[in-house]
Amino acid sequence: MKVSLTKFISIAVLSLTFMSASALASHHNSQRLDIFETVVADPSLTTLVTAIKAARLEDTLKGKGPFTLFAPSNAAFVELSEGTLGDLLNVKNKQKLAAILTYHVVAGKMMAADVVKLNKVKTVQGDDIVIDSSDGFKINNATVIKTDIMTSNGVIHIIDRVILPEI
């Protein structure tokens, strides 16, 4: 009887240990990264990370939100005219870069299904972006190539071009 009770207690302790570890792992996985952390984790957005840091917008994109980010891919930055990216990353152009990046951000969490119902939406920068869902999903002249990347403080849609406001 004593051996059975010892085995029972050992099995119960092991079961509780595994259940606790499983619950902890599940809780950890359910916590999403914020917009900035999600962008940093995506290898197709490294140029955007560099631009966000140069404009010192990390804290904004880590903020409470919610925000919708139309994130230009690395390939999108390559499409800029020669020298443009280098000029924008220059510290003297920080305000211009910040204006361009905030033109890619909309206040509120807007899933793709919500965005395509609109004709335009106001950006954090202050100007509107035009939405065209007649042939795919476009904002201004950029095609949305990946949608609805959920974050703890909003959502990200990846686009194939950098969109430029009138500045």
Question: What are the roles of these predicted feature ranges?
Answer:
Residues 3-6, 21-167:
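Mature, structured domains of secreted/extracytosolic soluble proteins
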Residues 10-20:
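Bacterial N-terminal signal peptides
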